[in-house]
Amino acid sequence: MSASGKKPGTKGTKRHRKITSCRECHRLKLKCDRVWPCENCKKRGIPNLCPNGILVSVSDKLIKLLLSRIDTLQNCVKSVSPNHESLIVSSDDQKIIDDIYEKFGEKPAEDTKDENRSQPIHDPDHPTLEDVAQMLGKLKVGSHGYFNYYGASSSRSCIPQQDPNSEEEDTFMQRPFLYPASSYNSALHWSHRIPNILNPSTLCDMLPVPQFAVRLMGLYFDNVGWSSHIIHRPSFEEACLNLYSAAPDRTNPQPQFLSLTYMVFCLGTLFTSPVLVRNRYSLAHEFFLRAQLCFDISVSGFTPSLDSVVAVMLMAQYSYFCDRLERTNFAWNCIGLAIRLAVAMGLHRDGEVFELSAFQLHMRRLIWSELLFFDRMLSMSLGRPFAISNDQTNVHEPSNVCDIQISSQSNCIPDPSYERTEASFTIFKAKLSKVIASVLDRAFRFTPPSYSEVEALTEQFKVLENELPDYMRISRDTPNLPPMVIIEQYSAKFLIQQALLYLHRPWFVRAATRKEEREHYKSSFNLCTSVSHELIHNLYSLMCLVPVEPLRWWVFRFHSLNAGIIQAAYALCFPNTDYALTAYNDLQYICRIFEHLKGGFMFSNKDYDFLIQLKSKVFNRFQLSSQGLTPEDLTEDVPFLHFNVPSSRPNSKSPDDSSMRAEKAAQLDGLGLSSDDLNTAQSENLPIYEQENPLLFDSLSWHVPKDDTRNDKSPLVPTWNADMMFEEEQKPIVPIDLSSMQDDQVSSLTTNEEFDPLSSFQASHSGSNFWTNMMNEMGIPK
């Protein structure tokens, strides 16, 4: 036996050793103190596992869970049973999906022996329910009439992710840069006088007295509301009077509605009597500044709502009565902002798909129709592309219902009336706006369109005019109607005539300036001449029937100005024809009308000066023609409307040869100006429409010294009388086709006992002999 105690030649047996560490310390290779629970397990917070337990890590749990779900998913895929548990949606949602599939899903065709039975085929031209849902987008409706619209193509990162239970509204913008001097400076106007001016309650206390407020609201709806029906009068009057409530529980007014209220007061003040208001222009601008301040209070001023859109539209209308705002393109910026606000609240989508109330649906359609019309008329006047095309909106036309027939408690929109309502004029403008959009789209193309497109658009205008209801047509009973109805009837006629002039004006220029193309475009030449003549005399008839103040609508200015320019262009090109004297009388006529219309307003002063200069140039042309000079000798001296004139060249640039430059230099020298002062003279002295369209007018070549004999301080009278402005021999000559009239009518006209421009013009256009003779004088064959 050895010293170790083992027998020699035998293996030693292992003895049972004591536990040296717990299982967790052994797994982590930590030194264990062998006191249960050990110190390491106590520090790790697992004393209950010591000494025999082991901790499974979180990562191991996730991996095992993932593996188990993968196995379950593989089994479900291999299984043919559709009743397996879904891993993506819950069981309740799966039941809803199955129900929808049973109702709307495409089912396999049933077996039938009838071979003639056709199978349902999916038509790509007819979108499915899923396609329509993808196009609509989503509309969020909040408290106080706030809306937010997000299209289906919008990025989720652009949509504010807020608590759905929160009452906080989404905002659209932070600061309105409407014109260079931003409107937030309007707060400084009262900061030194009124403390806490940025509080809506303070601005509410600054409202005029209730009696004056009621008077201003009446003046607005009588003189401005007819031009754009964007305010529901009963609801607005009720809400406006609630601002004067002295109830202790009265809530703070919304800044958007305060801005709208102040703009109604602003436009109503422009039509007040001088006896009631000493300086109405100053007071109107004060209301305008308060409206801007309400609009800019905090970020709530740009929360998309109907009140904010209407307030901005009224600001654009007011800018045409303020010379300072008109120079800064304020209306253009306002309408652009209003369209963005309207699109942000989904006005370009018909509200019926969003299940809105009848009142909200009706007002949204009215406001959107008026906004589109305003934008497109502004595009015509400034020569800029419009904002929204017809293909980007699906809003239906408003219903022809009275304001008193619908309210916020109405369950449905009443049946449309067959008589005239407050919405009738808006419905007509909505129909006309669609055709005007096609005209503008053609006008702003970079490639010259075909003349067949112009003829097709002309037919659309004729169809629209023929489909006018009886209450929108000028008739013999028109003088007996209320003033607002008379203005609407004449305005419908004016709008169609102006759109026709805008459409055919480029072709009129080509027919007048190019002899080789005169035969091809004689229809446009004839149309522009006759329509402009009719428009001027219709404006005269309207001024004889209604007060002057409502006629200061900015659209009338553009209508009559364009017609006067076309008549002047004819007289400059063909001074030896019989119609040239009539064209000159029309130009003189429109100058006197503008002198009478401008009154105390500044918006027509520049147009009046421009027409006076043009009339002087036509008069000089007549003097040169009387001395034996032929029109061909003076063709290069005649400026024309080259804007949007189709050209065979790809870049349609106006000619600028050495003779024209020398002529301009001579004219500038006669005015006491140098060529370096050209840009300054154009920017300071030209009207806004000439600054925006340098190719549309050539005012420097038309510039003549002002006529000092004219009286700029013409009295303001309720209605207009031609005897106040013309002598008997100065009244305009109306071309009349005597061959198409009876003997008694001819005798009454030759005696010149009474002049009725409406009836005389209708008589002059009863036949085509007059215009045929005029074309023969110009050398145009039949």
UniProtKB/Swiss-Prot annotation:
Q: Name one GO molecular function term.
A: DNA-binding transcription factor activity, RNA polymerase II-specific
- State where composition is biased (Basic and acidic residues): 654-665
**Among the record's GO biological process terms, what is one?**
DNA-templated transcription
- Give the UniProt keywords, A-Z: DNA-binding, Metal-binding, Nucleus, Transcription, Transcription regulation, Zinc
SMART domains this protein is in? Fungal_trans, GAL4
Any one Gene Ontology cellular component term annotated for this protein: cytosol
Residue ranges spanning the membrane: these are none
For this protein, the DNA-binding region equals 22-50
Q: Where is this region: Disordered?
A: 105-126, 645-665
Which InterPro entries does the entry mention?
Sec_Metabolite_Reg, Transcription_factor_dom_fun, Zn2-C6_fun-type_DNA-bd_sf, Zn2Cys6_DnaBD
Intracellular or extracellular location(s): Nucleus
Keyword Zinc annotated: yes
Q: Does the record's keyword annotation contain Transcription regulation?
A: yes
| Stated name of the protein | Uncharacterized transcriptional regulatory protein C1F7.11c
